């Protein structure tokens, strides 16, 4: 039906008969001469038709998004008529034949216009997908999936599918539940991850497993979250952290080569505590410096009791400083006010600062600091004339969070981030447990191997866990798993999952661990998030063919939707009104 894709045509084809097919992107009638921009997956080419052509009458019928097959000779555009914005901007096709394969209603959205309301784009997603940019995204997505399969297969991994209909074993988010028609009153759960099945595959001697897995989580959505998503999932037997990290680094190196980036190995490694203390995040963006500096000791003799008391409680409190070079000339009073309002959203009670000026140090904190304290702050932060040093003080968790966010906000405001840089990082030595209102829960998941389970302070127990971070975004992570029943029971006890509950929820796993489970570990990389970063897309919804909204609904199909009474009866379900 066609001889070329639109953008395959070049100056070397001038004089040749060309046949192309696609959609009418734009239509123009200039004094009797008709111009049609034809669009296919590759891009645009201009068709031109004058009244002498036998295709002219048909060309007059064409409107936006009509499906066309066109035949004609390629020629150079006239002087001054080239379009440098198009790959085919120097040539056009003089129409000899034109077939309208299908007509189109007036499109409710402009194809390729990202400023169109997103809800409207999602409602007509099949039109939104017609843009060449969308095609390039899904072409790359397909290529990355193929690279993943080839790379892992070469390393001896087997691609094995794990069940979609499974048992509910909550991993932090809510499960999506599927009622069983055969087993009245019982439910399957859609998997939040293949975690337990891939561990069972290791018990079964599969040694190295992977799949590009579909996962489901019923949780509140954010810009980078979807209720159903895809991850590159893998597990290895007889391995340690270094083995797993090596596989991930090799895989990411191969993947990013596809978009022309050479990334070096091994990736930098940073302990969790260092990431939190120096950057206020467990996924720090290292494309710029701006570290957080601990200055609690500079406030020990502060005349302000609030600051001095915080300084004397280093276990639970923090006083962090952020020195922004040259900010005194760049940040007006209104900008400083905006930054204060910004951190208040995340629990800050205000934003104290010192301005380092030619005639001395200014700012609301000066009166509370001794001369020695001020001197120490300048030494610790490296502050010079023209700088502004911001301070956060209070509860450790809150201060680290809002100062980390302030760090990012300042970097964005001052354009300190190299948008073309790729900064990979491993964050390691995560805490095994996190405190909640009802005790403790597993920071990653309860199947992670702890490093020092006998430590009396539960908050000091670390996990054999690791996250891979790119430019401040968590790409994925993994851990070495527990492979002995006794250790698994100990971890369950720490998070108040006692024997009866453990057997009810995870009895099949505990049983499997009795039969010679090998040491094993693995990882998962968020596939959608990876493609979002590689394509520099604004939202994860741009890289999923038919995504859900932030309210977990599909505007295209109107899912979820009610079901009829007969279906409910078959499933033994009665709805309360």
UniProtKB/Swiss-Prot annotation:
An annotated GO cellular component: cytoplasm
Q: What is its EC number?
A: 6.1.1.23
The keyword Cytoplasm is assigned to this record: yes
CDD domains noted in UniProt: AspRS_core, EcAspRS_like_N
Residue(s) at site: Important for tRNA non-discrimination: 30, 80
Gene3D superfamilies named in the record: Bira Bifunctional Protein, Domain 2, GAD-like domain, Nucleic acid-binding proteins
GO biological process terms on file: aspartyl-tRNA aminoacylation
Q: Which residues bind L-aspartate?
A: 171, 217, 444, 481
- Where is this gene product found? Cytoplasm
Q: Which GO terms describe its molecular function?
A: aspartate-tRNA ligase activity; aspartate-tRNA(Asn) ligase activity; ATP binding; nucleic acid binding
Q: What does this protein do?
A: Aspartyl-tRNA synthetase with relaxed tRNA specificity since it is able to aspartylate not only its cognate tRNA(Asp) but also tRNA(Asn). Reaction proceeds in two steps: L-aspartate is first activated by ATP to form Asp-AMP and then transferred to the acceptor end of tRNA(Asp/Asn).
* NCBIfam families linked to this entry: aspS_bact (TIGR00459), PRK00476.1 (NF001750)
The record's comment on protein family reads:
Belongs to the class-II aminoacyl-tRNA synthetase family. Type 1 subfamily.
Q: How does it assemble?
A: Homodimer.
> Any idea what this protein is called?
Aspartate--tRNA(Asp/Asn) ligase
Q: Which organism is it from?
A: Helicobacter pylori (strain G27)
Instruction: Please spell out the taxonomic lineage of the organism that makes this protein.
Output: Bacteria, Pseudomonadati, Campylobacterota, Epsilonproteobacteria, Campylobacterales
């Amino acid at each position: 039906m066609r001889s070329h894709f639109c953008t395959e045509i070049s100056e070397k084809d001038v004089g040749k008969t060309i046949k192309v097919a696609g959609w009418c992107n734009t239509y123009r009638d200039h004094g009797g001469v008709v111009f049609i921009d034809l669009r296919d997956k590759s891009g645009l080419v201009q068709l031109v038709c004058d009244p002498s052509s036998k295709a002219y009458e048909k060309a007059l019928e064409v409107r936006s998004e009509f499906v066309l097959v066109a035949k004609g000779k390629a020629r150079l555009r006239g002087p001054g008529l080239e379009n440098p914005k198009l790959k085919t901007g120097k040539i056009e096709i003089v129409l000899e034949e034109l077939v309208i394969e299908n007509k189109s209603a007036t499109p409710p959205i402009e194809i390729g216009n990202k400023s169109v309301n997103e809800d409207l784009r999602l409602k007509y997603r099949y039109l939104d997908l017609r843009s060449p940019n969308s095609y390039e995204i899904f072409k790359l997505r397909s290529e990355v999936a193929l690279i993943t399969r080839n790379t892992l297969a070469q390393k001896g991994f087997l691609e094995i599918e794990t069940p979609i209909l499974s048992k509910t074993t909550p991993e932090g988010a809510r499960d999506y539940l599927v009622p069983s028609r055969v087993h009245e009153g019982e439910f399957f759960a859609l998997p939040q991850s293949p975690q337990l099945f891939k561990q069972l595959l290791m018990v079964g001697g599969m040694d190295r497993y992977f799949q590009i897995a579909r996962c489901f989580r019923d949780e509140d959505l954010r810009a980078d979250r979807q209720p159903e998503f895809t991850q590159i999932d893998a597990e290895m037997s007889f391995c340690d952290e270094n083995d797993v990290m090596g596989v991930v680094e090799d895989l990411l190196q191969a993947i990013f080569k596809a978009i022309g980036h050479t990334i070096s190995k091994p990736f930098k490694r940073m302990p969790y505590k260092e990431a939190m203390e120096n950057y206020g995040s467990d996924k720090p963006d290292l494309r710029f410096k701006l570290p957080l500096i601990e200055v609690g000791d500079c406030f020990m003799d502060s005349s302000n009791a609030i600051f001095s008391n915080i300084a004397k409680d280093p276990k639970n409190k923090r006083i962090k400083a952020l020195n922004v070079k040259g900010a005194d000339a760049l940040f007006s009073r209104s900008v400083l006010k905006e930054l204060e309002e910004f951190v208040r959203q995340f629990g800050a009670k205000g934003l104290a600062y010192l301005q380092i000026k030619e005639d001395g140090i200014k700012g609301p904190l000066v009166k509370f600091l001794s001369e020695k304290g001020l001197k120490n702050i300048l030494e610790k932060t490296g502050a010079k004339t023209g700088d502004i040093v911001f301070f956060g003080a209070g509860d450790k968790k809150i201060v680290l969070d809002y100062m980390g966010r302030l760090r990012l906000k300042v970097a964005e405001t001052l354009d300190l981030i190299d948008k073309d840089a790729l900064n990979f990082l491993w964050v390691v030595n995560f805490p095994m447990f996190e405190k909640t209102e009802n005790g403790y829960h597993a920071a990653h998941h309860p199947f992670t191997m702890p490093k020092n389970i006998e430590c009396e302070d539960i908050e000091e127990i670390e996990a054999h866990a690791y996250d891979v971070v790119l430019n401040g975004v968590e790409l994925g992570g993994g851990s070495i798993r527990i492979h002995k029943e006794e250790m698994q029971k100990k971890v369950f006890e720490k998070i108040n999952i006692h024997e009866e509950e453990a057997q009810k929820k995870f009895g099949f796993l505990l049983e499997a661990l009795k039969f010679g489970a090998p040491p094993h570990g693995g990882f998962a990389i968020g596939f959608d998030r990876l493609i979002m970063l590689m394509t520099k897309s604004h939202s994860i919804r741009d890289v999923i063919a038919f995504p859900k909204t932030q309210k977990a609904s599909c505007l295209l199909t109107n899912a979820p939707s009610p079901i009829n009474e007969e279906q409910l009866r078959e499933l033994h379900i009665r709805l309360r009104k």
